[in-house]
Amino acid sequence: MKTKPVMAATAAFPDPAHAPLDIELPPVLGRAVIPLALTIDNLRAIESNVTSAWQFSPRSGWYKIYLLKKRRLLYLVPRRSDFRLSLILGRKAVAELRQGPFARQTERLLKTAKHYPEGIAFVFDRKTLDPDLLGAFLAAKLAT
């Protein structure tokens, strides 16, 4: 018998019947919205055709995905006064990053990143997010 998933206590938007609007995000994130906004601005500067969509998860509530056509670029899980931002990079993108200006940071993050068949998952929050670093990660992802 499967157990029902438990909603995270920090979920910013836990109500499955109410999909959040984008204007509801900044008040929930508080000061955490600043590095996130810089990151999204960097993404849109790299690729102007990026779209976003809200989806619901029984564990984390409503989360937002950023897409280029059907390709998932970023996952944003809003939390109260925080967020979890994740992306998956393939081998070619990681190889490109290891040769670039963020090689040292990439190597450090690779030590704790989760490895999956489709690529390597990098996860950031309010404290660990560097918008310039994530901009380089997104540029590498889009280039491959």
Regions inferred by a protein language model and the residue ranges of each:
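Charged, low-complexity, helix/coiled-coil-prone segments
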Residues: 8-9, 41-45, 75-87, 122
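Charge-rich, low-complexity N-terminal segments
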Residues: 1-44, 49-51, 57-58
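Phenylalanine-focused residue identity feature
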Residues: 13, 56, 83, 102, ...
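Exposed alpha-helical structural elements
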Residues: 20, 24, 38, 101, ...
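Well-ordered alpha/beta subsegment
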Residues: 107-144
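Residue-level signal for functionally critical sites in structured catalytic/ligand-binding pockets
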Residues: 52, 65, 120
